[in-house]
Swiss-Prot record:
SUPFAM superfamilies: EF-hand, Mitochondrial carrier. Keywords: Calcium, Membrane, Metal-binding, Mitochondrion, Mitochondrion inner membrane, Repeat, Transmembrane, Transmembrane helix, Transport. Its main location: mitochondrion. Ca(2+) 1 binds at D68, N70, D72, D79. It comes from the Eukaryota. Residues 1-233, 309-331, 402-424, 502-513 are mitochondrial intermembrane. Residues 55-90, 91-124, 122-157, 158-193 form the EF-hand domain. This is Calcium-binding mitochondrial carrier protein SCaMC-2. Calcium-dependent mitochondrial solute carrier. The chain crosses the membrane at residues 234-251, 289-308, 332-345, 382-401, 425-442, 482-501. It is a multi-pass membrane protein.
Amino acid sequence: MARPRSLVSPLLSGVFCQCDTVGGAPHTHDTPASPSLAAALAADPCGGLVCGGPEHETRLQILFQELDVNKDGGICINDLAVGLKRLGVHRTELELRKIVKAGDKDQDGQLDFEEFVHYLRDHEKKLRLVFKSLDKKNDGRIDAQEIMQSLRDLGVNISEQQAEKILKSMDKNGTMTIDWNEWRDYHLLHPAENIPEIILYWKHSTIFDVGENLLVPDEFTVEEKQTGMWWRHLVAGGGAGAVSRTCTAPLDRLKVLMQVHASRSNNMSMLGGFTQMIREGGIRSLWRGNGINVIKIAPESAIKFMAYEQMKRIIGSDQETLGIHERLVAGSLAGVIAQSSIYPMEVLKTRMALRKTGQYQGMLDCGKKILLKEGVSAFYKGYVPNMLGIIPYAGIDLAVYETLKNAWLQRYATSSADPGVFVLLACGTISSTCGQLASYPLALVRTRMQAEASVEGAPQMTMSKLFKHIVKTEGAFGLYRGLAPNFMKVIPAVSISYVVYENLKLTLGVQSR
């Protein structure tokens, strides 16, 4: 059988030191390196990448000159794209931007020689940590079983055949195992730190904000927690959610109006609903309730994250990440805790969305009037159906997403586990839609209970009585009032969230994808 051809040219693999950096001590050299290289390697004389000897510095300089296409003493994104292509290495524009951004210390848009060496050294250290985490047997080699086990720990199930396909893409000598040099050579000048990051390609709860923050939280590795990347992910996700919710707020308010006011006798259409809102309060009225909807993102995300981590400890898992069923249990309990903590804000959001012009001066005035007129209990109306809706929403969303993810990995992932933006958005959209469809009747009952006191002549009912009343007077279809605008906002919400999330990650220095 023909041996797989290396994806790295001899020039690229030749810049590396062949020291046993995983298990042994690095070489030392009598000949000192130049000042620029010495500065780059001061913290780690060998670094596993360059020993500091003249032959290695020469190879680095040759590689740098090869990538410096326009010969201006710096490697920009265009230089990197053209130079790597000449060497037989293909990277996406996003990957190239991340490489330059990660190494560009003076932020001039390009890498000089010292920055180039710094980037390679730092990246090599990350690759070494990942290699060690994958090498379960601690024998200096990675086999298919170790790949499968590592991904299983991260919630990604692949077959042995699939693991072997991934293995073959990196195995240069046909042994069906990967040693340190093969692993490092394959990932040279690639911004990801790689196979365990398959799970990062598939993280979606912080990316896809469709306005219903009931998703199971993402898993963060020990390294992400230690380096502070976890809070950067949360901030990026919160910012993405704020922009996404603001852009789709008119559809969200229309959904609330249709849930509360639409009936057989008042068959409100989408066009009629928008016309009614604009006629009553002008264009700005389309965004009523959006302020509180955005504000509640921060406390809810923070509480959910802390509660999720605590639930993991209570469950007692000794794994760094949980299995699917454990994630569902821990995520659902964390969702209950977070929703219980911020539920009064949910009631305020509904009341603000339903308010008439001049009814309230703002969120605080709304809260004050509800408290004086209806008492504290008003802030927890609809609490029970809201809590009951968490499990079907989160469970179905997670199950559908995991099913689609693993189906894609089994069928299409060969040398790369990166699904691409389209697959990510499609999986997130489909899973979120299924979750909402299952929990929508509970969401509608919750909204009507929250709005009862603000609707003239509306009866005060318990959850079960309201269910029976809706089915009796409107039929089963009545439990799905407002579903059309709710589904219409999913695709734009997911798309906007993803774009903003990716840009905020780069701004915050998150280089995990």
